[in-house]
Amino acid sequence: MLRQLFLASLLVAVPAVCGAQGSDSAPIRPFTIRVPDAVLADLKARLANARYPDALQGDGWTYGTDVRYLKALVDYWRNTFDWRAQERRLNQLEQFTTQIDGLNVHFIHRRSKQPNALPLLITHGWPGSFVEFTKIIGPLTDPAAHGGRPEDAFDLVLPSIPGFAFSDKPREAGYDPVRIAATEAKLMARLGYQRYGVQGGDWGAIIGTQVARNDAAHVAGLHLNMCTAPPPAGVDSSAGLSESERARLKVRDRFQAEETGYQQIQGTKPQTLGFALND
């Protein structure tokens, strides 16, 4: 758990220089994660000088992060976590960048040895990154080596959403899931794929749905591990439900009332939060 948190926290890298070409004139460049020593030293100094707020006695996670947990996390991050080891591990993956609509887009591209493998575009969510898919790259691209059937193999394309990991952040407002989906469809075309599958969860599910909707001529199928179906406006969501189902709705309502503060600030004033997190 702690290791996964830190993999998404160091976002400075230097791309390799030479690259391959896709199906159009825009270059596709190999990418290597290479965080400068000075960045790591600065991080260690910030962690060493971390200041912790006073906490209410016994509040735990009621009002946000438990300060005891935070202190343990910082201690692990500063004294135990080995970024260079993770860097070496991640650099074993086939990483690339390419410019689409003015943004450098980072992605993993693993081709299967099977000649008829179906290309599969998988998009992560928040707070995530391409790292969450590293354990499935082998089984999906080479199922025979993991007890599966060779004909079930996929070519994998795992992009980093703009603003995540090593993809450039958007430089203008309004870069919504529809625009991100268009970027991903262009990426698949640039890689030469005319027919491909789409998978996603969390924001990846929302983006993936838009890819399937707006690039339907090329999308063979869509798989989601987050499916939402809110009732139409003006419809009583509890109508016709059993008592146990109504109880679950109350759990949802309580979660929305007490546990979605992050949605409010990120959805309205992300810049303010960004200043604090960046420092």
List PLM regions with ranges.
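Catalytic cores of eukaryotic secretory-pathway lumenal/extracellular enzymes that build
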Residues: K71-L277
